[in-house]
């Protein structure tokens, strides 16, 4: 895919994307998994990622959050034949109740944005709110891994 994108300019080089055909092809390889990162919670305003808005009641929030998750789950199933099992919070914006909502929807794991090492045990609960290291553009793999390894020494 790198060659294809190198030869054909991405319509938005600041935020590359994959088509459903791309997703089908890379998941068929067996080397890549696609997970849920929300259908439409990638703004910072009026809602910050998937976080509950101030003054929003829990019933409305649950309906909104779960509806968004289900929409992407269904699209990926219908168009790509896959069902994500993990959810990654946009911006790492987490509302405490969402872990329970995700479990109700059948998710097996979730990732926040806290840069930390994860200690995986046989307890399935340890798979929720996993830490992750976001790699920004403009930094080498060496620099990125050095930072991540430094974080693991804490």
Where are the regions a protein language model picked out?
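Active-site beta->alpha N-cap acidic-glycine motif
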Residues: 1-31, 42, 78, 82
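C-terminal active-site subregion of NodB/CE4 polysaccharide deacetylases
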Residues: 29, 33, 39, 43-154
């Amino acid at each position: 895919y790198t060659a294809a994108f190198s030869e054909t300019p991405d319509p938005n080089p600041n935020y590359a994307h994959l088509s459903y055909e791309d997703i089908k092809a890379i998941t068929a390889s067996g080397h890549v998994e696609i997970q849920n990162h929300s259908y439409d919670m990638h703004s910072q305003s009026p809602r910050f990622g998937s976080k509950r808005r101030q003054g929003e009641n829990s019933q409305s929030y649950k309906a909104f959050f779960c509806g968004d998750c289900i929409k992407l789950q269904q699209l990926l199933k219908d168009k790509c034949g896959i069902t994500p099992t993990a959810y990654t919070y946009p911006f790492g914006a987490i509302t405490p109740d969402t872990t329970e909502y995700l479990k109700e929807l059948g998710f097996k794991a979730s990732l926040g944005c806290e840069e930390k090492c994860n200690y995986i045990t046989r307890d399935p609960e340890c798979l929720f709110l996993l830490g992750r290291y976001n790699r920004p553009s403009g930094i080498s793999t060496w620099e990125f891994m050095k930072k991540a390894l430094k974080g693991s020494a804490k």
